[in-house]
Amino acid sequence: VQKARELKLPIAFRVVVDGRDQGANTPQFVYDAGAEYAMSEPKYPDRKTPMPQDPIFQRYYEKFVAALAEEFNDPEYTSFIDGYGLGKWGEGHSVAYNKDDVSAVDENTETVKREVLDWITKLYAKHFTKVPLVINYHRVLGHPTSQGTANPNSESLVALAISNGYCIRSDAFGMNNSSWGYSTWEKAIAAQWRYKVPIIMEGGYIVSSHSYWNDPAGYRQGHPEDVRQGEFDSSAEARVNMMDFRVGQETESWFNDAFRL
């Protein structure tokens, strides 16, 4: 953050609370105060997953977002905020609501996930009034699963976020796997909302570390420019308003491997 400010560059970010994939992301004092959590791998005690519907967690999270806005609710410093951040990697899938089983789905799941999404999007919208807020349009948005066919309520959850003041983004551009990539459902959502709200793209592959050549699109190994072309084509189809080049190496790849785009 400090380096970006030295360079006079605005930043974009999401706040991740789930510890399954990265280690501790929610402070221990929140759990010490009584917030419920799941621990899917007991051998890694720091990898806790807070229950987003828990009132204690929500109380601390509300204080955090309010404090965050005091510093970052400024377009000079902030390009946009991905204001959901639940689930693995904060991508909005694999969201756990059962402390005993992070994958559990029951008769209350659809109600709880809608209530949580409504709460968190209204929270960010209350405090971030000067910078864009976005949500990942994921086929299993807010659900305990991570892939497969689209949940029938995902479309309405995207619409709910938009009604609360959000734009939309996807971090799977260029990925063509029908179970977890940027496929038919995602394209339909973009088509539904383009020209109505801004759309932001992020490429799904980090070409320096992901096996992008296994993608159904037939990207050639050793040819990251193939991935860049795939991302570009999907972005053009979606009519994106901004291309988020992700980590530093990805920015270098765009300029070195696909400058003509």
Label for each model-derived stretch:
Residues 42, 100-130, 158-174:
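Acidic, His- and aromatic-enriched active-site or binding-groove loops in soluble protein domains
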Residues 1-115, 129, 136-148:
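Aromatic-lined carbohydrate-binding surfaces of glycoside hydrolases
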Residues 152-261:
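Substrate-binding cleft of secreted/luminal carbohydrate-active enzymes
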Residues 2, 65-69, 117-125, 185-189, ...:
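Generic structural signal for well-ordered alpha-helices
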